[in-house]
A protein has these predicted regions:
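Acidic, His- and aromatic-enriched active-site or binding-groove loops in soluble protein domains
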Residues: 121, 127, 175-209
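Substrate-binding rim/cap in mid-to-C-terminal beta-strand-loop elements of soluble/periplasmic
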Residues: 109-121, 348-393
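Metal-dependent active-site segment of extracytoplasmic phospho-/sulfohydrolases and closely related
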Residues: 54-55, 304-346
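Short, structured active-site-proximal loop/turn typified by the sulfatase FGly-forming signature C/S-X-P-X-R
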Residues: 66-106, 155-157, 376
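Polar, surface-exposed loop/tail segments
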Residues: 380, 384, 394-409
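Active-site His/acidic residue clusters
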Residues: 64, 70, 170-174, 241-252, ...
């Protein structure tokens, strides 16, 4: 075969193949199949053989250096030496918030990573300076919990700081299968003030112009959670009864009850006695006051959280409802910088490597948590915490990251 014949024949074959290719492309393609709808069974009673879980958000941003890296110099001796070493659990000293585009090492974002088990980009919806009004699109751990188990909203509890009001409204997502029906309930001074104002108006404490001003104030406070159109939908009689007892004990001035993270400890202790939550998240945050400068604000705040965890642990041991049936999960919302050029190296948390580096501790009875004397050094992600709690309590977290911390034990 000469060159001319070869080109003629191969050209004919190529043209035939090309025409077949275009003919195939011209044929109508089958439509893409939509994803399978998320169909979930009806909620079931919470099993008696499953534990209560207390999630300690070691908030405000803390470094490993002052907490778990040097046990002999730790500012949280109870958490490390008692909760972990003596009472038994698993320490994950090599946890991080993954360095991805749009992933932020800050308090609100870190809290939502913990709640949803997903790294996500969040944008403030209020358009106010420094505001962090974020709306999770994926279900929160409390929604997973209440969708799987027939538990009341006050049994799925967040204890929140008076200084981070935006975090009051991370109680449910916009997910169509979950959402407000499976929300958590919040205890905070903001909620207490709302309760007092609503009660005052109902009991005719004000009149005339002052009454109109107070009604507008209450409307503004309630409307901060713009997604709740019907206030009766989120009314919880058990919470109202809780605040009435709080009022009888502490009054309304705010000068008698503890403040800062000590307040969160006190609210948690009251909640355990009055409400008996099965899943409770405590959003500590005072270490963040180091933004103002003095390093003692930071180290002292770590010690205050540690003391609070000790009080809460002792309360679980004194209460048959919680004794030998409660798992503690301790994890920071984010780390802090280690900037040696600053007078206080850990003053901020500006996306540095150290700000991404955190840890986690899980402690509880051996039937729920492995007791390992040696830390698990394998790299872990903050978002693994969600699946871990679901595994411990026996409920699925379908849209969260599928990895559990316990897989590394």
């Amino acid at each position: 075969m000469n060159r001319r014949d070869f080109l003629h024949k191969t050209g004919a074959v190529g043209a035939a193949g090309l025409s077949l290719s275009f003919a195939y492309q011209d044929q109508p393609q089958p439509p893409a199949q939509p994803p399978e709808p998320l169909v979930l069974p009806d909620p079931i009673p919470y099993p008696q053989d499953k534990p209560n879980v207390i999630l300690i958000r070691f908030g405000g941003g803390v470094r490993r250096r002052e907490t778990v890296e040097f046990p002999e110099r730790t500012y949280c001796p109870f958490i490390y030496h008692e909760l972990y070493e003596r009472h038994g659990g698993v320490l994950f000293p090599n946890m991080e918030i993954e360095s991805l585009d749009g992933i932020v090492t800050s308090h609100a974002q870190g809290t939502l990573y913990l709640l949803t088990g997903k790294y996500d980009r969040y944008q403030d919806i209020s358009s106010k300076p420094l505001a962090e009004r974020f709306v999770p699109q994926a279900p929160t751990i409390f929604e997973y919990f209440r969708r799987h188990y027939a538990v009341k909203s006050h049994e799925a509890l967040i204890v929140n700081s008076e200084d981070r009001i935006d975090e009051e409204f991370y109680t449910f997502s916009n997910h169509h299968v979950y959402g407000i029906r499976y929300r958590s309930t919040v205890l905070s001074l903001y909620r207490y003030k709302t309760f007092l104002l609503r009660n005052d108006i109902a009991n005719n404490r004000y009149e005339g112009r002052e009454l109109e001003e107070k009604r507008r104030e209450l409307e503004q406070m309630e409307n901060r959670d713009y997604r709740v159109e019907n206030r009766n939908l989120v009314a919880v009689p058990e919470i109202d009864a809780f605040w009435r007892k709080w009022h009888e004990h502490y009054g309304r001035s705010g000068l008698v009850n503890p403040r800062g993270d000590r307040l969160l400890t006190t609210l948690s202790l009251w909640a355990m006695r009055e409400l008996k939550p099965k899943l409770m998240m405590i959003n500590y945050q005072d270490p963040d006051y180091v933004h103002w400068g003095p390093r003692q604000f930071y180290t002292r705040a770590i010690s205050i959280i540690d003391e609070g965890v000790r009080e809460i642990y002792n309360a679980t041991q004194a209460d048959p409802y919680y004794r030998d049936n409660t798992v503690f999960v301790v994890v920071p919302d984010c780390g802090r910088d280690s900037n040696r050029s600053m007078p206080v190296p850990f003053q901020h948390h500006f996306q540095s490597r150290s700000a991404h580096q955190i840890f986690a501790l899980i402690a509880g009875p051996r039937r729920f948590v492995p007791h390992q004397r040696r830390p698990v050094d394998e790299l872990q992600q903050q978002i693994y915490v969600t699946k871990t709690i679901g595994q411990i309590m026996g409920f699925p977290t379908q849209l969260a990251n599928e990895r559990s911390l316990l897989a590394a034990t």
